[in-house]
Amino acid sequence: MSALNWKPFVYGGLASITAECGTFPIDLTKTRLQIQGQTNDANFREIRYRGMLHALMRIGREEGLKALYSGIAPAMLRQASYGTIKIGTYQSLKRLAVERPEDETLLVNVVCGILSGVISSAIANPTDVLKIRMQAQNSAVQGGMIDSFMSIYQQEGTRGLWKGVSLTAQRAAIVVGVELPVYDITKKHLILSGLMGDTVATHFLSSFTCGLVGALASNPVDVVRTRMMNQRALRDGRCAGYKGTLDCLLQTWKNEGFFALYKGFWPNWLRLGPWNIIFFLTYEQLKKLDL
């Protein structure tokens, strides 16, 4: 068995941070779209945004362009932990399963993707909670990352920082279990078929495909996860809106219809698409460094 390779961990973290910075305003509109229209939360009952472009324009006009990067600090911190662990663990698990990349199968890649997604997302969950809380707030009433962290910890305790961890792990299992294997398999078949070489164009097409498939598979879980993380706990520890993840899913479907589970799909895909393209193009170039 070969020694643990550090490069996928470092390259994965760097590429993840680069992709996050490039697509963060789209992610912010996705969060705002997903939390609006909740009949059981007066703070988010109003439908303020008609779609992604309207949200971008209204937030920029009313809160300033800086508001489009509300929550970027915990988002970068999240990618430094989540992205690093996710890619490093995925690549390491694959090499434990099979020695050569040519011998990888879809099943092996999916299992490795699911495991790496669950592990990395569970560890990085507090940064995810911070990011969503900061994105949901109007920038006029928003404090910094440390203030937000202390506010959650003081009012909700340690449990507040791991709120929605099961949903986050489920979403990560779906996203990572779909996106990374789809990228690897698409890239492998394009190269082995002779249609394309190991080029930037191949990386672009493979990453675009995995972003679309990942968005379709993960959006319902993402909506529920976002709402669960955004709701505040009462002083007695109870939650004001949803009793749990299943209750959130059923209430959302019942009160707003099935397609409410696909709220924010376009910004979700338009984020996952460019995010994956930036990530994989950066990652593939970093792999070529002679270190």
From Swiss-Prot:
Domain of life: Eukaryota
Induction notes from the record: Up-regulated during fasting and in the regenerative phase following renal tubular injury.
Coiled-coil spans in chain: none
Transmembrane segments: 9-26, 71-89, 106-124, 164-183, 204-224, 264-283
One of the GO BP terms on file: inorganic anion transport
Expression sites by tissue: Present in kidney (at protein level). Expressed predominantly within the kidney cortex in the proximal and distal tubules and at lower levels in the testis and white adipose tissue.
Broad class of where this protein is predominantly found: mitochondrion
GO molecular function: solute:inorganic anion antiporter activity
InterPro entries linked to this entry: Mit_carrier, Mito_Metabolite_Transporter, Mitochondrial_sb/sol_carrier, Mt_carrier_dom_sf
Keywords: Acetylation, Membrane, Mitochondrion, Mitochondrion inner membrane, Repeat, Transmembrane, Transmembrane helix, Transport
Places the protein is found: Mitochondrion inner membrane
Solcar repeat ranges, renumbered to this chain: 7-96, 104-189, 198-289
Topological type in the membrane: Multi-pass membrane protein
Complexes and interactors: Interacts with VDAC1.
Role: Antiporter that transports inorganic anions (sulfate, sulfite, thiosulfate and phosphate) and, to a lesser extent, a variety of dicarboxylates (e.g. malonate, malate and citramalate) and, even more so, aspartate. The sulfate/sulfate exchange is much higher than the phosphate/phosphate and malate/malate exchanges. The transport affinities is higher for sulfate and thiosulfate than for any other substrate. May catalyze the export of sulfite and thiosulfate (the hydrogen sulfide degradation products) from the mitochondria, thereby modulating the level of the hydrogen sulfide.
Protein name (database record): Kidney mitochondrial carrier protein 1
